[in-house]
């Protein structure tokens, strides 16, 4: 089979070629003449855990449904394992979908739910027996094979839904917010199980979610979507540490954003004066905007900001303010500091189990030039 390939690096840094299991090329999908998916380009590599992350209504679920075949592409190309999927129905695509609602058959027990697809394909009885047994073992549900969905917990139902998807041995497993219906503790447990399952099977997983922590913890790469378009594709670390747009910076985790323009350009740093009069110095990297008077947004993560009662000597990015809120979070403490220009910033620091400062305490907030990031100001920011 003639599959497209992509260059990647293994842990030793040696470049290798990996086939692409899913390719979207300038894909559009319209509803009532409005684009739900707007010129999307993305590649999913064989064996990759790829997440599409974004807020409600951003087009991520529609994109997944296009890959599954539940919706048809209006413009552009969609390929799975190098083959065009135009007019190919869902049952003929080498994919299986796990839905948030699980979509189990209530009148069938666990075994029959998992076996349903194989029986529909008229697989041999011996093959059905061995593959269902294997799938239930993978998700640790062998002992509950005779139970009905109504007799299972949410986590157990999720495992059955996963087994039903895996039993057909698809090239690509599609996950539609698979953990969204679970409580926080169970969701974290299932994240670990899902990650282990992916590593053990080596299959390609494509997941859509609005949960940033879920995407960051599970994914090899993430595509961040907004208003039908891809804002950025990268590893979890790239997405969090080096966001390309202010939307990505603000959506992934928490951040403090300062709008301003570049007033000084030097080889190793730029200086920005914000709209509220602060002067911020940012260390340069290959993505740093480099044009005088260029409108930019400065992003500073709360955990990168330090607090002190006295001003550090000879330090850029040090601003006087006062505490207006202190929130105890157990292992961490979240501080809200109002700077002298009236802007409120969030600061997250480890809990050192000392006495917490009182509200209205005068304080200095500061951060290193390398701990903030300048991003091009977009017209819709």
Swiss-Prot record:
According to its UniProt record, where is this protein located?
A: Cell inner membrane
Question: Mind telling me which Pfam families this protein's record contains?
Answer: ABC_tran, TOBE_2
- The UniProt entry lists the main location of this chain as membrane
Enzyme category, top tier: translocase
- Membrane topology reported for the UniProt record: Peripheral membrane protein
CDD domains in alphabetical order: ABC_PotA_N
Binding residues annotated for ATP, in chain numbering: 54-61
Domain named ABC transporter: which ranges?
Answer: 22-252
Alphabetized PROSITE patterns for the sequence: ABC_TRANSPORTER_1, ABC_TRANSPORTER_2, POTA
Catalyzed reactions per annotation = ATP + H2O + polyamine-[polyamine-binding protein]Side 1 = ADP + phosphate + polyamineSide 2 + [polyamine-binding protein]Side 1
Write the record's keywords in alphabetical order, separated by commas.
Answer: ATP-binding, Cell inner membrane, Cell membrane, Membrane, Nucleotide-binding, Translocase, Transport
Q: What is its EC number?
A: 7.6.2.11
Subunit (UniProt): The complex is composed of two ATP-binding proteins (PotA), two transmembrane proteins (PotB and PotC) and a solute-binding protein (PotD).
Family per similarity comment = Belongs to the ABC transporter superfamily. Spermidine/putrescine importer (TC 3.A.1.11.1) family.
Q: What does this protein do?
A: Part of the ABC transporter complex PotABCD involved in spermidine/putrescine import. Responsible for energy coupling to the transport system.
Name the chain's protein. Answer: Spermidine/putrescine import ATP-binding protein PotA
Q: Which organism is it from?
A: Nostoc sp. (strain PCC 7120 / SAG 25.82 / UTEX 2576)
């Amino acid at each position: 089979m003639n599959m497209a390939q992509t260059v990647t690096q293994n842990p030793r840094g040696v470049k290798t070629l990996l086939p692409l299991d899913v390719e979207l090329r300038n894909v559009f999908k319209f509803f009532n003449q409005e684009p739900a998916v707007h010129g999307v380009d993305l590649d999913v590599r064989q064996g990759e855990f790829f997440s599409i992350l974004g807020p409600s209504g951003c087009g991520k679920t529609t994109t997944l449904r296009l890959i599954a075949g539940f919706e048809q592409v209006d413009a552009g190309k969609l390929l799975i394992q190098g083959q065009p999927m135009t007019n190919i129905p869902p049952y003929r695509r080498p994919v299986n979908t796990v839905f948030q609602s699980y979509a189990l058959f209530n009148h069938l027990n666990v075994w029959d739910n998992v076996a349903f697809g194989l029986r529909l394909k008229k697989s041999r009885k011996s093959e059905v027996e061995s593959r269902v047994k294997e799938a239930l073992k993978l998700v640790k549900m062998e002992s509950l094979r005779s139970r009905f969905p109504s007799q299972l917990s949410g986590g157990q139902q999720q495992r059955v839904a996963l087994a039903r998807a895996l039993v057909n041995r698809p090239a690509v497993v599609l996950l539609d917010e698979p953990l969204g219906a679970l409580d926080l503790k169970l969701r974290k447990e299932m994240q670990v199980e899902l990650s282990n399952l992916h590593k053990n099977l080596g299959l390609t997983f494509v997941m859509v979610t609005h949960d940033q922590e879920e995407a960051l913890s599970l994914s090899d790469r993430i595509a961040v979507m907004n208003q039908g378009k891809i804002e950025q594709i990268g590893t979890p670390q790239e997405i969090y540490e080096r966001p390309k747009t202010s939307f990505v910076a603000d959506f992934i985790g928490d951040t403090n954003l300062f709008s301003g323009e570049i007033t000084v350009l030097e080889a190793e740093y730029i200086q920005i004066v914000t709209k509220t009069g602060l002067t911020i110095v940012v260390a340069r990297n290959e993505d740093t905007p480099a044009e005088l008077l260029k409108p930019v947004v400065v992003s500073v993560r709360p955990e990168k900001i330090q607090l002190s009662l006295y001003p550090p000597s000879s330090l850029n990015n040090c601003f006087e303010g006062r505490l207006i809120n202190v929130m105890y979070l157990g292992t961490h403490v979240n501080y809200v500091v109002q700077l002298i220009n009236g802007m409120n910033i969030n600061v997250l620091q480890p809990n050192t189990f000392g006495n917490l400062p009182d509200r209205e305490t005068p304080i200095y907030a500061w951060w290193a030039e390398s701990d903030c990031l300048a991003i091009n100001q977009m017209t819709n920011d």
